[in-house]
From Swiss-Prot:
Keywords: ATP-binding, Kinase, Magnesium, Metal-binding, Multifunctional enzyme, Nucleotide-binding, Serine/threonine-protein kinase, Transferase. It comes from Chlorobium phaeovibrioides (strain DSM 265 / 1930). Residues 280-285 are annotated as: Important for the catalytic mechanism of dephosphorylation. Its EC number is 2.7.11.-, 2.7.4.-. ATP binds at G168, K169, S170, G171, L172, G173, K174, S175. This is HPr kinase/phosphorylase. GO terms for biological process: regulation of carbohydrate metabolic process. It catalyses: [HPr protein]-L-serine + ATP = [HPr protein]-O-phospho-L-serine + ADP + H(+); [HPr protein]-O-phospho-L-serine + phosphate + H(+) = [HPr protein]-L-serine + diphosphate. Belongs to the HPrK/P family. InterPro entries: HPr(Ser)_kin/Pase, Hpr_kin/Pase_C, Hpr_kin/Pase_Hpr_N, P-loop_NTPase, Ser_kin/Pase_Hpr-like_N_sf.
Amino acid sequence: MSLDQKGLKKRSVTVAYFFENIGTTHDIKLRRLNSVDEQKRRIFERDLHRPGLALSGFTNLFTYKRVQILGNTETRFLNHLGEEERRQAFDNLVRFKVPCIILTSNNKLQPDLLEMATEQGIPVFVTRHSSTKAIYQVTDFLDDQFSLYQQYHGSMVDVYGVGVLLIGKSGLGKSEIALDLVERGHGLVADDVVVIRRKGESMQLSASRNNIIDHFMEIRGLGVVDVKANFGIRAIRDVKEVLVVAELLEWNKEMEYERLGLDTKSTKVLGVDVPLVQLPIFPGKNITVIIEVVALNVLLKRYSNYVAAEALTDRIKQVIKNDERTEGEIVL
């Protein structure tokens, strides 16, 4: 089952959405300085811009589609100019269709300049944070908004702190296994539809649920199960990093399956290589316990660099080496 699908991305977000939501997820508060229709202004890029050169008159290559940040340098430059020069300098900025302007460090904009921005329909905000912190917070928020994402059919479970993505053909019991893991004390992130995001150029993948399905599960023969209502808040997770993919396969006696674990496999998810474990399914096999061991193996490798198959191989090699040294005597 291939997971290497092309990621999707938002084309833009409205300034209204940006203003209403950034304070809920990030440590920054914006205050409106004028009243314009923020729904008509859209942000198309995650990157921000400080328009120092544009204010001085050089507008070649001006990235006006970005959020414009006016810090101490820009506001003091405007304030030291005469009234006519100041208006001319600010016109070099507002004559372009910029999404919005953010003043940092509680800087003030002259009333005539604020009126110019309002006439052009440009929202102006102010924050008490410094330019450095404001740029970091706004960029991080826009990184989230413009991150690559894709929806996958499967189940996502937090097992011992390890994000395990269960995939496979319909009817193999992914939801039943996820439910069994929840009953054993682990946390459900998503079932049936798993939304996976890759933020910026990061190699980290975060999985979350579909907001409509939420933490409901469909179990064949039983119906819909509300995991949060049945098992409590401890049984659910909002977001989890994808650390391993467990693919459930129909048992095929003609197919050779991994027996030692020396041949490590991986699969690409949104361009990121993720460890892959393929598990054949047949009656009587306790997949839930195996998934727990898969998660524990990830922890062992991550924190102790320990792989059981390699440890066993090294032990066998040592026995053979000792055997050759003692001319046939078996060393235990």
